[in-house]
Amino acid sequence: MAGSSAGGGGVGETKVIYHLDEEETPYLVKIPVPAERITLGDFKSVLQRPAGAKYFFKSMDQDFGVVKEEISDDNARLPCFNGRVVSWLVSSDTPQPEVAPPAHESRTELVPPPPPLPPLPPERTSGIGDSRPPSFHPNVSSSHENLEPETETESVVSLRRDRPRRRDSSEHGAGGHRPGGPSRLERHLAGYESSSTLMTSELESTSLGDSDEDDTMSRFSSSTEQSSASRLLKRHRRRRKQRPPRMERTSSFSSVTDSTMSLNIITVTLNMEKYNFLGISIVGQSNERGDGGIYIGSIMKGGAVAADGRIEPGDMLLQVNDMNFENMSNDDAVRVLRDIVHKPGPIVLTVAKCWDPSPQAYFTLPRNEPIQPIDPAAWVSHSAALTGAFPAYPGSSSMSTITSGSSLPDGCEGRGLSVHMDMASVTKAMAAPESGLEVRDRMWLKITIPNAFLGSDVVDWLYHHVEGFPERREARKYASGLLKAGLIRHTVNKITFSEQCYYVFGDLSGGCESYLVNLSLNDNDGSSGASDQDTLAPLPGATPWPLLPTFSYQYPAPHPYSPQPPPYHELSSYTYGGGSASSQHSEGSRSSGSTRSDGGAGRTGRPEERAPESKSGSGSESELSSRGGSLRRGGEPGGTGDGGPPPSRGSTGAPPNLRALPGLHPYGAPSGMALPYNPMMVVMMPPPPPPVSTAVQPPGAPPVRDLGSVPPELTASRQSFHMAMGNPSEFFVDVM
């Protein structure tokens, strides 16, 4: 291959400087024709080269920028590039690395002429050059004509784990390469405008053209440009007599690493137990503009990356496992990839999706999120910090088995996840760094929510990772239970689960206390039409309905039943829940207007009379106060309940001495239904003798004031509270 450049000489003549084949020193000729009218015939008449020689001239292409154009028509005018003509002359008797229109740098004279092209391996779908998106070939400015050296290397790595590759070094010596080597490189570098072939058998001690028995396992690295700092080039200079000529860049990647570019970054976990090799080729680049990084050149069929399907040619490789590829040289990246693939366990690839000006296949906008600039290095460091937010399960740090849809620590793999396990254990497994749930910073109403995840992602994760869900709807109910239990939290304390909302993990260090404190009866699980309602829990400091506090006292020991109710100052932590009480609730759950229990009737000697004023049982405390004149102690008439039928048998005559746990919302069950006793939900208390009994408000209305401040004259509702809270066997919680 030869290169030349020409500039305008004197009036009516053109100076032509050309490189002939592999010679290092250029030649200068003067052609007595103006530069704007010089043709190939004029150039040939001066050189008088053999007829089989090829002539390449430097020109500007509208799509690719600076290219080397072959001209064979003697009448064609030679392109004038910035007032000069740049050319390369290739003799027909010199073996060349390429027969494609773009000319290439010189081959060493030690390489024999290329035989017919061997077939490509079945794993490879395309070469690096032709597999990259169009955005990798922008127009290049004329500043490249200074021929300053830049470095751009590319390596195709077919990573195979099944058998080690050892070759005798004498088989692939410094001067001997197989005849198939040049043709293999020709096929693979067909998409490049320039290339300088550097045989690098040091990487794997295999030949470049190992295309027969070890085709998919060969490693090679080629440099498209000359660099005095290239380690590989220094080796080849020591090994070969002739120095490859200095070439200017003829193609460049688009600056996808600029801070103004928005990148969609994904993390892919690959199961290497099912596949023998990774199946990607990487392209590395660094230049004076600061653009750098390792890019996916092409993807080979049959590999782990091709089976996953999410990584595309042109994506930027940011991190592999815990190794950051930002600003890493191409040779170091090849070495790191080779070492990682040879180790057991899964491989986690963090890639930035490439921006393509013609998005048709793999370019998609992030879901429901604005596009913002991102720094890949900052993202990787943030991701590394995020992985330490939640401790993994005890066990080996390396995961022995992994499926394409899950990657759980060893502590969970042995036993698996099921709906019968503790919710906290399932949530901890979901919060593990390698669980597969996408947890990252989210933007909502211009507010950054750190370490958030989408509700639909939680449902999908539960449905695919937890055994026991017959359909996805059940997994959604389970996610609603996680929200009620406080294991996941909404940003604004929304207590109704929605798949379109962002959530964060709650306190995963607490045990049964943190789980029970947030449970309530008959809460909407979000699985029906009521899931569209935006039910918000109160902010801290608001009225406790339905308050979600934490336990501030030790559990007392269970105590035998007592026929006396506890004094109301001991029931100050009791909270009501659940909207307005209506006739759908059993009479035993109403706080007003019901018949005295057996204990109460025995003391008074006669039943309470019912007043017909209140029908709904949802009167406020102020209404009870207004009727205080009709209320008497000791069983006098003046009840404020409705005139409905007497309460169910199961709700009368029960010992009332129990204290409701904070945050529990008792509701009545359908009439006539016996309910099991749940010791987790109620604790029996030994009450002191009640000196004064006061009335409590019916359920469904938020308390206006503390129960301890209710006047002692309001006593008519004591019996209804008797029945609502007296029998723990009817107190139940339906978690799901």
UniProtKB/Swiss-Prot annotation:
Residues 159-171 have a biased composition (Basic and acidic residues). This is Segment polarity protein dishevelled homolog DVL-2. Belongs to the DSH family. Residues 267-339 form the PDZ domain. Residues 193-208, 581-598, 614-629 have a biased composition (Low complexity). The DIX domain mediates homooligomerization. PANTHER family: SEGMENT POLARITY PROTEIN DISHEVELLED, SEGMENT POLARITY PROTEIN DISHEVELLED HOMOLOG DVL-2. Residues 93-255, 558-665 are annotated as: Disordered. Plays a role in the signal transduction pathways mediated by multiple Wnt genes. Participates both in canonical and non-canonical Wnt signaling by binding to the cytoplasmic C-terminus of frizzled family members and transducing the Wnt signal to down-stream effectors. Promotes internalization and degradation of frizzled proteins upon Wnt signaling. Residues 218-230 have a biased composition (Polar residues). It is a peripheral membrane protein. Phosphorylated by CSNK1D. WNT3A induces DVL2 phosphorylation by CSNK1E and MARK kinases. Changing G65D: Loss of oligomerization. Abolishes activation of Wnt signaling. Its main location: membrane. Changing Y27D: Loss of oligomerization. Abolishes interaction with DIXDC1. Abolishes activation of Wnt signaling. Residues 111-122, 558-568 have a biased composition (Pro residues). Changing R84A: Strongly reduced interaction with DIXDC1. It is found in: Cell membrane; Cytoplasm, Cytosol; Cytoplasmic vesicle; Nucleus. Ubiquitous. GO terms for biological process: canonical Wnt signaling pathway; cochlea morphogenesis; convergent extension involved in neural plate elongation; convergent extension involved in organogenesis; heart development; heart looping; heart morphogenesis; intracellular signal transduction. The gene is Dvl2. Residues 433-507 form the DEP domain. Keywords: Cell membrane, Cytoplasm, Cytoplasmic vesicle, Developmental protein, Isopeptide bond, Membrane, Nucleus, Phosphoprotein, Ubl conjugation, Wnt signaling pathway.
